[in-house]
Regions:
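N-terminal topogenic membrane-targeting module
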Residues: 25-93, 98-99
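Feature marks short, highly hydrophobic, charge-poor N-terminal signal-anchor/signal peptide-like helices
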Residues: 1-12
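Active-site recognition of the HExxH zinc-binding catalytic motif
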Residues: 77, 173-191, 250
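Alpha-helical transmembrane segments
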Residues: 14-26
Length: 289
């Protein structure tokens, strides 16, 4: 009798384990669909939140921190300051920053990163970041990415504060860590794939972007292999030599905002596509007194 009870109990456990595995797989599939729907709704919510914030400004203390740290601040035209500050406020209110190590000046970091990420979309909807769940801030080394200064997936950004702090004041070097990683985020947003095409495959601009990426990939390869200086930083060439193209949009974005005049001169098609996408014209930005 005891053996029969034991066998029945064992059979029940096996059945429950099987049932759990089967249903957990189903849940994961359903969860991904639900997550996408939630993110789309989040996009609507973010745009509404930005609309409610319209007219709000950063405090003098916050503005001073941005002026003292972000090199691009002195170049941004006055007519973009209001929408830039509104997006910065909305960003800080709606996105989660995670201090991955103790001792970081996290409030200052939040303001600086939010400000640069918001400059990227100063003329675009904040729903571009609808899939973003968290921004992880590390002192120096990013866990599992020892050689990287920053990483991006569709849902998460990782940034090294030591590197960011050292380089953020350089407004014309063509490489901006925050803009670079958040450009990846925008690239991921429409289809979950980073292929340097920031629009949906259903967009009327998709084929034009596709051709541009292929053509620019070839140009960047030739420049890199020939050791030539180029408006789009060599990192894009280094990645491209392996056949990868995700870095073209992110490196191109950094060049667009920080080397606008040169990019327009050397790669007019790239510049015009970026100008149309971002809605700004950095080639005509002039430093303010």
């Amino acid at each position: 009798m005891e053996i029969e009870i034991l066998l029945i109990a064992l059979g029940s456990v096996v059945f429950l384990v099987f049932l759990y595995r089967a249903t957990s797989n189903i849940t994961k599939v359903k969860g991904s669909k639900v997550e996408n729907k939630i993110d789309e709704r989040k996009g609507e919510y973010l745009n509404q939140a930005l609309e409610r914030i319209k007219g709000q400004k950063l405090s003098e203390e916050q503005r001073e921190i941005i002026q003292n740290h972000i090199g691009l601040y002195q170049w941004v035209p006055n007519h973009l300051i209001a929408p830039w500050e509104e997006r910065t406020i909305a960003f800080m209110e709606n996105f989660t920053f995670c201090e991955m190590e103790k001792g970081l000046p996290i409030e200052k970091i939040e303001l600086i990163v939010a400000s640069e990420a918001s400059l990227l979309i100063v003329q675009r909807p904040i729903s571009d970041y609808r899939h973003l769940h968290r921004i992880n801030i590390w002192k120096e080394v990013i866990k599992n990415h020892k050689e990287a200064r920053g990483t991006a997936t569709r849902n998460e950004i990782n940034l090294s504060w030591n590197y960011l702090e050292k380089t953020i004041g350089q407004a014309r070097d063509g490489h901006n860590l925050t803009l670079h990683e958040f450009a990846h985020l925008i690239d991921f947003a429409d289809d979950g794939i980073a292929q340097s095409i920031p629009v949906s495959s259903y967009s009327e601009d998709f084929k034009e972007w596709q051709k541009l990426v292929n053509d620019e990939h070839e140009r960047l390869m030739k420049a890199y292999e020939g050791g030539k200086n180029y408006s789009i930083r060599a990192y894009g060439g280094y990645e491209s030599i392996k056949g990868d193209k995700p870095e073209l949009f992110s490196c191109g974005t950094s060049a667009f905002f920080e080397r606008g005049s040169r990019l327009k001169r050397e790669c007019p098609k790239v510049y015009l596509m970026m100008q149309d996408f971002y809605g700004v014209d950095p080639a005509n930005w002039r430093i303010k007194d």
